[in-house]
Amino acid sequence: MTRIHPTAIVEPGAQIDESVEIGPYAIVGPHVTIGARTTIGSHSVIEGHTTLGEDNRIGHYASVGGRPQDMKYKAEPTKLVIGNRNTIREFTTIHTGTVQDVGVTTLGDDNWIMAYVHIGHDCRVGNNVILSSNAQMAGHVEIGDYAIIGGMSGVHQFVRIGAHSMLGGASALVQDVPPFVIAAGNKAEPHGINVEGLRRRGFSPDAISALRSAYRLLYKNGLSLEEAKVQLRELAVAGGEGDAAVTAFVEFIDASQRGIIR
């Protein structure tokens, strides 16, 4: 049976699984869907066309599914879709998408979103991502799986942060961070491969060595970006265990619209 505190407001039309728990003074809007075993903390607001999957935990005073902070927004029925097993802590704000993009903000599975984080409209957050307290994502930001964003960091709109990368605390990021790379500073600069993170996630020594070689080609050998990309493509077909990782590294760089940190 759904456990809804008597002071909570669940508007008609909301689809709430019978195992959901909703705390005191929380508000759930009419276009919200909440999956099994999800917990909504006290004073939280879940609104808009928002879908929450299973086993999510929403902290006190979180604002999930609010209108985009975009002056072009004209109350179109855009969406927020959140997957399973996410922890979203106190005072976090996550906004729906805009029609100027694809109309949906997405958050995958198993993410750890700490207090006071902001995830702007049209952001795409992958799986197993950690967003530390007060990290701020502007609109249209993309974050790959297993990325870690340090506290008090600001990420410019349309920036892409690659899988398994790490952004240090209090950083200002205005260009893309390739996968597997550590970045930090204001403005953020590259500081090597995220070796410890890759070891923890089961990357082989050979794969890590190949990524270190890729990093040196891109950042340490004095090559232009185009020159580095030629050599990176050769490294990606070297026949070793790191080929797939280096290929992902090169493909991310090729797809960059804002340019990568250098």
UniProtKB/Swiss-Prot annotation:
Record lineage = Bacteria, Pseudomonadati, Pseudomonadota, Betaproteobacteria, Burkholderiales
Q: Where in the cell is it found?
A: Cytoplasm
What is this protein's function?
Answer: Involved in the biosynthesis of lipid A, a phosphorylated glycolipid that anchors the lipopolysaccharide to the outer membrane of the cell.
Q: Tell me any Pfam family this protein matches.
A: Hexapep
Instruction: Tell me which Gene Ontology terms the entry assigns under biological process.
Output: lipid A biosynthetic process
Quaternary context:
Homotrimer.
Task: Please identify the protein, giving its name as recorded.
Answer: Acyl-[acyl-carrier-protein]--UDP-N-acetylglucosamine O-acyltransferase
State the pathway, as annotated in the record.
Glycolipid biosynthesis; lipid IV(A) biosynthesis; lipid IV(A) from (3R)-3-hydroxytetradecanoyl-[acyl-carrier-protein] and UDP-N-acetyl-alpha-D-glucosamine: step 1/6
* EC annotation from Swiss-Prot or TrEMBL: 2.3.1.129
Q: Which chemical reaction does it catalyze?
A: a (3R)-hydroxyacyl-[ACP] + UDP-N-acetyl-alpha-D-glucosamine = a UDP-3-O-[(3R)-3-hydroxyacyl]-N-acetyl-alpha-D-glucosamine + holo-[ACP]
